[in-house]
Amino acid sequence: MSRATILHVDLDAFFAAVEQRDRPELRGKPIAVGGGSASDRGVVSAASYEARRYGVHSAMPLRTAARLCPELVFVRVDGRKYGRVSKQVMAILRRYTPAVEQISIDEAFLDVHGSEILHGTPTEIARSIKAVIVGELELTASVGVATTKLVAKVASDLDKPDGLVVVPPGEEAAFLAPLPISRLWGVGQKTAAVLAEFGVRTIGDLAALPDDLLARRFGKMGPVLALRAQGIDTSPVSGAEPARSVSHEHTFDIDTADAEVLERTLLALSEGVAGRLRHGGVKAHTIAVKVRDSSFHTVTRQRTLPEPTDQTEDVFAAACDLARPCLLYTSPSPRDQREHLVCRLL
């Protein structure tokens, strides 16, 4: 039986928490990172937990957020600052293991197999990581500990903020079974709506569906969903091996065709990629952008640069040029509402 050595570390309300840390007057107040005022175009990039109590959440139009919470304080996105703090967090994680797979600016997987002699059990490592992040960066993180990346990620989201959830080996399916189907990694609103037609409300309901039914309805994704519902995930933490590529990915919870929002997201992704290149002392010669819609249709475009680079500006310029046709293809229309958009920069 596999041991629970996979950790998923997720910073709590990252952008908003950084702003509240750096600006004491914002602490304890509902804030939305994403624009200077309610009149700005665009959406909320991050909401503090005080704002979430009013129903404000990421990807919500700024005007809507202001209506829900009249006392909401708006703060402009500072991608460079968040990128710097992200690098500090990842440096802390690498003190415990070289097997760190950063999957976004504010979250990463770790495989702590082999780290126990120096740092203790996986649960002790998780507690230590949380304490160090609070002590050194004045930020909180939620951590899930499990045998697989899939289950660890679900676990980290169950007790936010500042949570720690451990799923013992052999209990993955039982842990997932009572959770709403929306908790399962990769299931969005559109997929959940289709599953609801078959009476699926929980992850356990999905696990009970016949494999052939899932294959007929979802094609090649059917077997994948069946395995995920049982907590089965064989993907390794990629940081355990020398990386041949550096990537960042962002999933939009709500459809958007707002050019400002898309450009801002690409800038944050570009800063994350360039920062990791500089941290690793390497440069990229090829830039690729991958966009996947809710039907699992993927569009990928790439470009070889004249000279290798580790600069945010170069990565961002190439990413914008590459992304425009992809985003035009996947932009939502009244006849084709997308469940979500995934944009990945490599």
Describe these PLM feature segments.
Residues 340-346:
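Hydrophobic alpha-helical segments, chiefly the membrane-spanning helices
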